[in-house]
Amino acid sequence: MPGVYGATTCAVLAPHDLITGGTAYEFHGHTDVKELAMYIQDTITVRNWSFNLGIRGDLYNGLAIARQAEPRVGIAYNFKPTNTVFQVSYARTVETPFNENLVIASTGCSSPFLALLVPPLGVPCNLGPIVPGHCNEFHVGLQQAFGKYLVIDGEYIWKYTHNGYDFGVVGSTPITFPIEWTASKIPGYAVRLTVPNFHGLTAFVVMSGVAARFFLPQVAGLPIIPVGNEVFRIDHDEIFNQTTHLQYQPFKRGPWLSFNWRYDSGLVAGASPCSAPTATCFSSTPFADGGGANIPSGQVALVNTVSGLPLTADQEFQAGLTCNGKLAAPNPLGPALATCSAAGLASIYVQIPKPGTKNDDHNPQRIQPRNLFDIAVGHDNIFHGDRYKWSARLAVINLTDKEALYNFLSTFSGTHYVTPRAVTATVGFHF
């Protein structure tokens, strides 16, 4: 890439460019990881109180060494007059490094090839090896029964990790490796409402949300992001999702009808191109606007903002990217659009913040919200047999044939669409 990479960089990378007749790069590394865990735990019940007490000790020997005692305690109280259970718990845990390609992550900066290939342009490869961290995790919960027709379960979670782990990718390959951030804070909640059986009607509603916040700078592993002190979200983060399920069976031995509604506010889609002087938009934002892309001011480079590589036409098509109201890649076979005006960049499937509104922590790129509906009808014992039973079921998944993404260029799973409308008929014989 003339004007972007210098002669030294090209001299290191060119021998392994298979398009020009180069050879595959081979990495050889080895280490032994040994871990010993010892723990003791007991449950004590006193009237309406229940105590779960324990302590664990971990001895970790890998590329780094850690020794840590990990206390944990859980307390529950059953207030019988109102059928209420309160619970609270705390656990301290040692966070050991992921083993997948741990050697590459910890020693890769000593390889000139990896030190130039993986880090963003201009980011030095000088971080140390992955070391164990520790986590403080708190849970607060409530269970409330309203007679025999409604039960509510709720829980709130705080998880604070020092030296929080994530994964990076070697270029556009499927090779992943662990990385380490300064810290992470992951609060979240989960609520479930259940109607066991009310005159043939059963129902439940499950809802949850999680904030997966990670704190720069990266402190270990091959660098994958510019140096900074910001807070950003990874693609586990979703503000709200819920599933509502209703099933009605008017007669105990008769047919039933079910309905399912799923809503998702959208996962973070950090690989989507964007324009802002932030860590996650660095590779798609022009030099003049505080980024690292060699393009005119006011433009956006259509690149994977995690790897820095240009998006292919297929990837632009999958993301539903539009430029000034027109598809960036109408055909997944090409050609791909290289840049777009920052004001004109949008997407059918991804929420891309407009210029001046992007914030890695509070307004990141996200998958568009979606509603999905399923219905089913069936009979579990058509001929009312005792020993032998026949059943039948007809189900329609994604009733409205909604077209949407689950994620975009996720580190492990890539890009996935929701299942298109599908009709399934099943006949069963039970004996």
Give the location of each predicted region.
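Membrane-embedded beta-barrel scaffold of Gram-negative outer-membrane proteins
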Residues: N78, F86, A115-E180, K185, ...
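Gram-negative outer-membrane beta-barrel transporters
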Residues: T45-S50, Y156-T161, F177-C274, C340
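Transmembrane beta-barrel strands of outer-membrane/channel proteins
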Residues: L53-G57, I75, V88-R92, N101, ...
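C-terminal beta-signal and adjacent terminal beta-strands/loops
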Residues: R262-P353, I367-L372, H379-F431
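Signature of Gram-negative outer-membrane beta-barrel scaffolds
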Residues: M1-V85, T96-P97, P120
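Transmembrane beta-strands of outer-membrane beta-barrel proteins
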Residues: F51-L53, P71, T84-V88, I152-G154, ...
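Transmembrane beta-barrel architecture of outer-membrane proteins
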Residues: H30-M38, G57-N61, I65-P71, Y90-V94, ...
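Short loop/turn motifs that connect adjacent beta-strands in outer-membrane beta-barrel proteins
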Residues: T45-N48, F79-N83, Y149, F198-G200, ...
